[in-house]
C-alpha cells in the first residue's frame, strides 16, 4: 500500500534549543544555550494510512516492559474533521493479563493519531477509580489533537458498568489488577501506544507528555517517579498522592463518629467554616472571604503535634451541652466529641508504622469553605454507629472498594471494622507500595530535563491538599529547593476545589456579608508545560490566573497571595 506521509512545517517563537525532526526521524539539536527559531517538522497521514496493514493487528509481548500475555489491536477507524476535532485515526487495543484466573482483566486502551502530527504524544490519565478510557480528543486542555498531539490512554485494567456504576468487583481482590491500577497499566499502555505511533508515522515522538487530573494527577506523579525515561513533561492537577490512605480516610472519620457524641452533623457546617474564616481570612492582609495564607491557617487547626491544643475552644458548647443541635447558624456551638472529630479531620493522621517511602502521616484536609464535601460529613446514621438501626445502610464512598476489596479482601466487608495497626497492617504496606505516589526522589526525571507542573486547590475535599503539600515538601527536603525549582512547580490556588474552581465565602472573617464571586483560577497548563519543555521558557514562581475580568497571581509553594499596597503578590511566610 502506498504511504501518504508528508512533512508539515511550522515556525514558532524563539526558543533556547531547536530540534529538527525530518521525514526519516533524524533529530538535530541546536547548540545548547543559543537562541534560535523553533522549527517543528511533523508529518501527515490520511485515511489510507489508517489501516491494519499499516498499524498491524498485534504487538509482541516483549515490546511491553511490564509483564503481559499479549497485545491485540482492533481494525483502525478514520474520523473525518468536525467542529470539535480534526481528522484523526483511532486504534483500540487490549493488553491481556498474565493472570488468567479471571480476576485480572484486560487493559483496554485507545490511541488517536491526528492527520497533522507535530511529533508530540501525550498520555492522558484517568479519574476516580478508573474503569473507562478517558476523553482523548482534548477536552478542557485545549483540544490536544489540534495542537498536533497523538493522544492515548486506558481504562487501567478493569471496566465500569453503565453510567457511573462500578461494574464487577472481582478485580478488586486480584493483585495483578490492583498493581495495574497503581502503576503497571501506565507503562503497559505507554509502550503499546509508542509501537502504534511508530508504525503509523514511521518515527517515535520527539516530545512525550503525561497530563492528568485527580487519579490522573496521581498517575502523572507515578510516571515521573517510576518511569522517568519515558516522559519529557508531566502536568498533574489535584493528584491523589497517598491513594491507599485517601480511600481509607472517610472510614477513619466514620470510625471516629461511631459514638453518637462524636457525630458532626450538617447543621454545624456554617459554624465550622465561619470559624475558619474568623481565624484565617485576614492572615493574608485582607478580610475578603478567601483564606489565601493556607499554611498559616493549617498550622492553627492541625493539632497533630499537640493534641491538648484546642483551636475550637471558642466554639465549645457551655458545659459540653448543645442547647440547640438543629441550629444551622454560624453561632452554633460544638460539643467535645464533635471537636475531637474535627481535630481528626484537619490534622495529620499518624500511621501505626511508616508506609511506602517512609511516610509516617497522612495530611488529611485543610480548613475550607466546604466542610461537608465528599462525605466529610454524612446526613444519616450508618451501620455500626451507636444507636443506628440494624437496617441502616453501610457507609459507602467513591473509594470504599479500595478498603473492602484491596485491603480486606472482601468487597462485602464492613470498612468500619478496620483497626489501625491491626490484622491488615501487612496488607496496608503492600498496597502502599503499589498505589501511593510518594517517592520524593525525582532525580532521574530531573536529570533527563523532565519538567513537572502540579496544581492543587486548598478547598479540595476529594483529594487531600494536606497530603499533596506534604509530598511536595518531602521532594524539597530530599532534593533541595534550588534543584527542584529547576524542573518543578507546585501551584497552589487558595479556596478552590477538586475542579480548581471556587468562590469567596459570603461572610468575611470580620463577620460582614459580602458579594460572592469566582476566584481566578484559569490557566493553560498544557501550554505552560510545552513552553518549558520545548522552548526552555521557565514558568515564573507567580503565574497570572483569571476568572472573567478578574485576575490574581497563582503562587508556587511555599508562597501565597498576600495583600499589601492595594494588590496581591506572592509572598512566603
Go through the PLM ranges and name each one:
Residues 9-22:
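Bacterial N-terminal signal peptides
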Residues 26-120, 133-139, 287-291, 300-412, ...:
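Catalytic-loop region of hydrolases
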Residues 96-179, 183-187, 214, 225, ...:
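N-terminal cap/lid subdomain of alpha/beta-hydrolase-fold enzymes
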Residues 128-202, 248-249, 410-434, 496-516:
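Cap/lid segment of the alpha/beta-hydrolase catalytic domain
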Residues 203-214:
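Alpha/beta-hydrolase fold nucleophile elbow
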Residues 217-228:
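Short glycine-enriched nucleophile-adjacent loop
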Residues 454-456:
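Short beta-strand/loop motif that positions the catalytic acidic residue
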Residues 462-466:
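Conserved alpha/beta-hydrolase "acid-adjacent" motif
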Amino acid at each position: 500500500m502506498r504511504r501518504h506521509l508528508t512533512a508539515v512545517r511550522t515556525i514558532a517563537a524563539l526558543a533556547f534549543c531547536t530540534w529538527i525532526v525530518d521525514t526519516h526521524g533524524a533529530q538535530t539539536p541546536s547548540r545548547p544555550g543559543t537562541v534560535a527559531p523553533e522549527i517543528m517538522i511533523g508529518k501527515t497521514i490520511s485515511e489510507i494510512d489508517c489501516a491494519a496493514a499499516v498499524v498491524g493487528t498485534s504487538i509482541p509481548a516483549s515490546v511491553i516492559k511490564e509483564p503481559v500475555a499479549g497485545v491485540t489491536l482492533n481494525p483502525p477507524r478514520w474520523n473525518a474533521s468536525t467542529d470539535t476535532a480534526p481528522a484523526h485515526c483511532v486504534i483500540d487495543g487490549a493488553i491481556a493479563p498474565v493472570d488468567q484466573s479471571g480476576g485480572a482483566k484486560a487493559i483496554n486502551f485507545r490511541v488517536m493519531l491526528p492527520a497533522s502530527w507535530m511529533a508530540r504524544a501525550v498520555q492522558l490519565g484517568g479519574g476516580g477509580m478508573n474503569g473507562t478510557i478517558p476523553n482523548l480528543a482534548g477536552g478542557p486542555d485545549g483540544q490536544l489533537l489540534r495542537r498536533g498531539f497523538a493522544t492515548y490512554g486506558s481504562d487501567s485494567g478493569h471496566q465500569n458498568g453503565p453510567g457511573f456504576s462500578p461494574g464487577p468487583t472481582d478485580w478488586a481482590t486480584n493483585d495483578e489488577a490492583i498493581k495495574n491500577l497503581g502503576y503497571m497499566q501506565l507503562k503497559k499502555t505507554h509502550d503499546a501506544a509508542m509501537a502504534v505511533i511508530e508504525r503509523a508515522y514511521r518515527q517515535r515522538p520527539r516530545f512525550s507528555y503525561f497530563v492528568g487530573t485527580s487519579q490522573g494527577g496521581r498517575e502523572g506523579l507515578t510516571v515521573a517517579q517510576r518511569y522517568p525515561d519515558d516522559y519529557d513533561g508531566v502536568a498533574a492537577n489535584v493528584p491523589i498522592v497517598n491513594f491507599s490512605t485517601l480511600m481509607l480516610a472517610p472510614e477513619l472519620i466514620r470510625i471516629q463518629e461511631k459514638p453518637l457524641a462524636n457525630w458532626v452533623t450538617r447543621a454545624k457546617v456554617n459554624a465550622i467554616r465561619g470559624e475558619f474564616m474568623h481565624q484565617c481570612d485576614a492572615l493574608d492582609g485582607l478580610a475578603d472571604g478567601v483564606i489565601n495564607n493556607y499554611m498559616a491557617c493549617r498550622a492553627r487547626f492541625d493539632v497533630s503535634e499537640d493534641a491538648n491544643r484546642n483551636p475550637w475552644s471558642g466554639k465549645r458548647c457551655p458545659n459540653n451541652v448543645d442547647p440547640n443541635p438543629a441550629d444551622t447558624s454560624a453561632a452554633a456551638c460544638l460539643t467535645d466529641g464533635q471537636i475531637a472529630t474535627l481535630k481528626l479531620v484537619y490534622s495529620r493522621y499518624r500511621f501505626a508504622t511508616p508506609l511506602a517511602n517512609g511516610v509516617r502521616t497522612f495530611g488529611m484536609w485543610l480548613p475550607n469553605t466546604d466542610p461537608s464535601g465528599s462525605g466529610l460529613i454524612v446526613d444519616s446514621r450508618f451501620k455500626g454507629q451507636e444507636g443506628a438501626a440494624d437496617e441502616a445502610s453501610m457507609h459507602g464512598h467513591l473509594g470504599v472498594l479500595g478498603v473492602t476489596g484491596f485491603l480486606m479482601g472482601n468487597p462485602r466487608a464492613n470498612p468500619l471494622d478496620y483497626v489501625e495497626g491491626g490484622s491488615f497492617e501487612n496488607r496496608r504496606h503492600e498496597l502502599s507500595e503499589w498505589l501511593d505516589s510518594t517517592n520524593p526522589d525525582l532525580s532521574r526525571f530531573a536529570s533527563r530535563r523532565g519538567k513537572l507542573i502540579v496544581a492543587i486547590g486548598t478547598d479540595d475535599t476529594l483529594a487531600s491538599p494536606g497530603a499533596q503539600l506534604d509530598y511536595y515538601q518531602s521532594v524539597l527536603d530530599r532534593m533541595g529547593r534550588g534543584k527542584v525549582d529547576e524542573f518543578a512547580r507546585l501551584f497552589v490556588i487558595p479556596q478552590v476545589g477538586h475542579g480548581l474552581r471556587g468562590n469567596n465565602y459570603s461572610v468575611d472573617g470580620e463577620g460582614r456579608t459580602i458579594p460572592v464571586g469566582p476566584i481566578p483560577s484559569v490557566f493553560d497548563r498544557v501550554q505552560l508545560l510545552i513552553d518549558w519543555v520545548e522552548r526552555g521558557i521557565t514558568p515564573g514562581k507567580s503565574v497570572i490566573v483569571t476568572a472573567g475580568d478578574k485576575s490574581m497571581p497563582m503562587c508556587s509553594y511555599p508562597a501565597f497571595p498576600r495583600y499589601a499596597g492595594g494588590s496581591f503578590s506572592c509572598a512566603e511566610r
